[in-house]
Amino acid sequence: MTTHRDAFHPRLTNPAPIVRRPPSFGKDDAHIETDLIVIPTEDGHSWDGMIFRPRHGAVDPRLAVLVIHGSVGNYLTGMPRRLAFHLAQEGYAALTANTRMANYGVFFGTGLIDRAQLDIAGAVRALRERGFGRIILLGYSMGSTMVSQYQAVHEPPEVVGVCTIAHPLSLPQSLRRRWERFGSIPSYNEMCTIISRQMEGGDDPERDRIIIVRRATGPTEHPEDAEIWTYRTWWKSRGPEALSAESRRWVGLLRVPLALIQAADDPLIPQPEGALLATLAQEGGCPEVHLEYIEGANHTFDGHELDAVDATIQWVTDLARRARAVRRRLRIRIG
């Protein structure tokens, strides 16, 4: 674990075995309530979101966690759903929100990662309008990069921390490494050449086209090992000039506490990348950095989902506790 007190010693977590069962609807959700909302953006889009909150006994009624999904994910599947559900069970409000990168956005040209900042801004605004004055940004996988950039660039006063799960150092680098491992068709360099030629060095949506990459996620020519992009969505999020997709560029600009909860056996993100992100954040001036590896977990935390959730909730709880202590001291001084 890396914290502000112990800067360079990652801790491999190996919790005692716990007997767990799937959530039982009508029982486990009896103490939470949900609110389906629509989140408008400044450029005229709107995205779905759902607020999960404790029915009674919120730890901090003005604190909310904003959860942002990963690649081809959405607000109600996989890790975002688990995080929001369990956060609410533990007394924290959570908004899990779609962005233009959700689902098939990158397949059909709308998933431009540099514009996703408007989607996160819309979600922050939605929480602000509902009375939440303290917000923790929480991103999974690609969502980690998105929330890191948003906080680094915009620094909204409501945000008190950034929590990231399976945080890549560089989305372009991760994809290139995977394509080279499986021998993608086209290769990374060939993809750059194709897009540069077809787009003529510009960003005209009229020139955008769908492109299929074979052997992108596995070693066969079968459809399940292929990826679908458009010229623009790939170039913006995985191309060599995709600055929005480079977390190593953003973490050093964070001025709120940062958590890096990484999978110890992630085939997409080697362990040294988490350590490097922690170092870059600390050297850049981030006030607190927490680095934790979930032993035995892959990128999607298969079989270890609740270990990642537990680590997240522990960090959120510690951060909320310290924030309450600071507010109490301020009230005493003012009084």
Where would I find each of the regions flagged by the language model?
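The serine-hydrolase catalytic nucleophile loop
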Residues: 72-84, 272-273
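Alpha/beta-hydrolase active-site loop
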Residues: 109-130
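Primarily recognizes the serine-hydrolase "nucleophile elbow" in alpha/beta-hydrolase
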Residues: 132-194
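Conserved alpha/beta-hydrolase "acid-adjacent" motif
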Residues: 267-276
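Catalytic histidine-centered segment of alpha/beta-hydrolase-like enzymes
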Residues: 297-308
